[in-house]
């Protein structure tokens, strides 16, 4: 209903403002996924949250990417297993046609994703 959408939009704005204040205060922000009502991001489409961190919170593209990788792993206590590309860790990575360190929006363009590796195994190869 319309009232629910309005309330969700107001909540979303307040949520973004809160994240922005925390980021500006130096709080580590971890990107996660969950469904939070009408404005929630569908599972598997959370790359849009990287754009929100850049365009609405004020992070650089690499800070946003770190929020979804290294910082998220630290928040989960899994930094020894995932979150960065290091010897002995699970190799979860994407190869994209573009430079997400300059423009994170490339990560939500499914046609730009050339290769997906999960735990060191190729899961998708479009090269």
State where each predicted segment sits:
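Short, surface-exposed loop/helix-turn segments at secondary-structure junctions
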Residues: 1-7, 107
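His/Asp/Glu-enriched, well-ordered alpha-helical/loop segment
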Residues: 2-3, 11-99
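C-terminal cap of metal-dependent C-N hydrolases
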Residues: 68-70, 87-127
């Amino acid at each position: 209903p319309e009232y629910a959408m309005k309330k969700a939009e107001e909540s979303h704005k307040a949520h973004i403002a809160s994240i922005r204040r925390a980021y500006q205060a130096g709080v580590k922000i971890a990107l996660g996924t969950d469904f939070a009502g009408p404005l929630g991001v569908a599972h598997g489409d959370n790359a849009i949250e990287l754009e929100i961190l850049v365009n609405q919170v004020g992070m650089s593209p690499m800070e946003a990417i770190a929020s979804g990788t290294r910082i998220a792993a630290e928040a989960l206590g899994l930094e020894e297993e995932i979150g960065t590309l290091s010897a002995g860790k699970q190799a979860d990575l994407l190869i994209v046609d573009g430079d997400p360190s300059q423009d994170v929006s490339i990560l939500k363009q499914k046609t730009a994703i050339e290769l997906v590796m999960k735990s060191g195994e190729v899961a998708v190869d479009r090269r």
